[in-house]
Every structure is written in C-alpha cells, then in structure tokens.
Amino acid sequence: MDRLVIGGRELKNRLFIGSGKFADERVIRDIVAQTGVEVVTVALRRVSLSGDGENILHCIPKECVLLPNTSGARTAEEAIRIARLARAAGCGNWVKIEVISDNKYLLPDNNETIKATGVLAEEGFVVLPYMHPDLYAAKELERAGAAAVMPLGAPIGTNRGLKTKEIVRILIEECSVPVIVDAGIGKPSEAAEAMEMGAAACLVNTAIATAGDPLVMARAFSQAVAAGRLAYLAQPGERTEYARASSPLTGFLGS
C-alpha cells in the first residue's frame, strides 16, 4: 500500500500548496474542495494573532493541515521564535523552517536551518525544513529530527523548474525521511517529473497563485503529482542508447 505519513498523519494527496500571492485568497477553499489538497503553508505574519482584521486562516478549510513557515527569519533563533509563536497562536505543531539571509536569490541557510530543526524537534514540533539540496545537510537534518526534507527545485518564485534534479535524485535515494520538492516548480509537467523520480510530494505556490486561472492550474498540478507518483510505482522501463523493435523484424516473410 502506497502511504505518505508525516508526523503521524497519513496524507492522501501529495500536492502541498502555499497560500501567498493569490489575487483572491478565497480561491484557496475552492482549490481544496476540488483537488483534495490537505497541506497548506502559511506565513505567520499573515495570521492575525489578536483575532482582529484580515486573517489568512479564514480562507483555509479547518480540515487542512496548517504548515506555518518561518518566512522572514534570518537566523535559527528567529525561526525558533516564529515557530513558537505559530503554535501559541493555534496553528498546530507542524512547521516549515525557512532561514534566509540572502536577499537576492533567497537561498536557504542550511547551517542555521539544521540548528533550528534540532531545537524545535526536541520541543515536539513536526519539522519540515526548506533546504538547499545537499546530501550532507539532508543527513544532518535527519539526525536533528526532521520529519521530512524540502529541497528547492529552483529559487523561490522563479517558476524555472527542477534545476536541481540530479542532487534531488541523490537525496531521494539516500534519505530515510520523505523528500518533498519545494520552490521553483513552474509547470505541472515539472511536478510530475519530480514525482517520477520518487519524491514523496511537491509544494507549489507561485505557479498556481499567479496562473491566469489558479483553480484550473491547481487541478492540473494535483493530477500531475498523482500521475507522477503512479509512474514511479509502475517502475518505468530502462532507457537505452539504441532502438529496440517492439515486434520481431525477421521471420514474417521467410528467411
């Protein structure tokens, strides 16, 4: 049986979505209803801690798993503080660690991410760290208690696709926790490719939120992720350098 279990929770849909950049955040409810998406990320700064004013949580169905991220954190200490605030605000104990001090490419700081992961895992958080693809860092995150690792496919928000494919492939082969491809995926075909490689899930935000029709794009991504997973489970045939006939080339008309 093909199961994805993270933090004791079994997930049936392997597409995770972000909640940022939508022109109308109310479409998130429709996306969840039509695709069955179960995990939605949210930046804590978009959650009303006082209960007053606009609150992104009003647009996310209660049956979803909230995955607060530590967007804005530049150090492990800041990420830890944001995660604790999110849990205190009622966002649950799942957290996506983002520690970014690079303002140009927004690449994650793996060293600070490892530090934050260790502390928060000890405190009972289900930690999903966003990371720059690197096998040694992924192994350190595992040892620190990460429930999954989330390597980037390309820099955040670029829609450039799976540029880190070969390193992500190594992580999938060598990591004992789920590998969730996060950031940079721009088209459903790219999500399908990640899943065909054996990724456990894909997290997509910009490609859906900035599409001409976000709801239709979300449906396309959900189907692509499911198809890619099925293809992986089906064990695709090997690639060969030369052509191989699918029917005999001799004997039909005699020798």
From Swiss-Prot:
Subcellular location(s) of the protein: Cytoplasm
Signal peptide span: none
GO BP annotation list: thiamine diphosphate biosynthetic process
Pfam families assigned to the protein according to its UniProt record, in alphabetical order: ThiG (PF05690)
Keyword tags: Cytoplasm, Schiff base, Thiamine biosynthesis, Transferase
UniProt entry tagged with the keyword Cytoplasm: yes
Active site: K96 (schiff-base intermediate with dxp)
Residues binding 1-deoxy-D-xylulose 5-phosphate: G157, A183, G184, N205, T206
One GO cellular component term noted in the UniProt record for this chain: cytoplasm
Family stated for the protein in its record: Belongs to the ThiG family.
Quaternary state and interactors: Homotetramer. Forms heterodimers with either ThiH or ThiS.
Summary of the function given for this chain in its UniProt record: Catalyzes the rearrangement of 1-deoxy-D-xylulose 5-phosphate (DXP) to produce the thiazole phosphate moiety of thiamine. Sulfur is provided by the thiocarboxylate moiety of the carrier protein ThiS. In vitro, sulfur can be provided by H(2)S.
Name this protein carries in UniProt: Thiazole synthase
Primary gene name: thiG
